[in-house]
Amino acid sequence: MIKLYTAPTPNGRKISILLEELNVKYKSIIINLDKKEQFNRKFSNISPTNKIPVIEDCDNKKIVFESGAILIYLAQKYKKFLPKNNYWQVMQWVIFQVAYVGPMLGQAH
């Protein structure tokens, strides 16, 4: 199972979308950004940048933060959406989304 520490933001939503597409069992833990919960001690222990999203993979106790890294981790773990023959093409679009599209969506949020 995956624990997803998230908030209703574009970066938080993209991880839950992928988890749904992968049909993976997960639990969402909502971090209230308005109440500054991202700065509490417990969350700071798993997110060195105090940002969402973060996942905790309960199968192997791995913690992954940053949305792009999480997307890649999940795609590799579940062997879906990251084809070997088009790996670099997919990676280009993931990085493009993280670097350009994501920040614009965050500003519109």
Regions found by a protein language model. Give the residues of each.
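GST-like domain detector, emphasizing the conserved glutathione-binding G-site
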Residues: 1-109
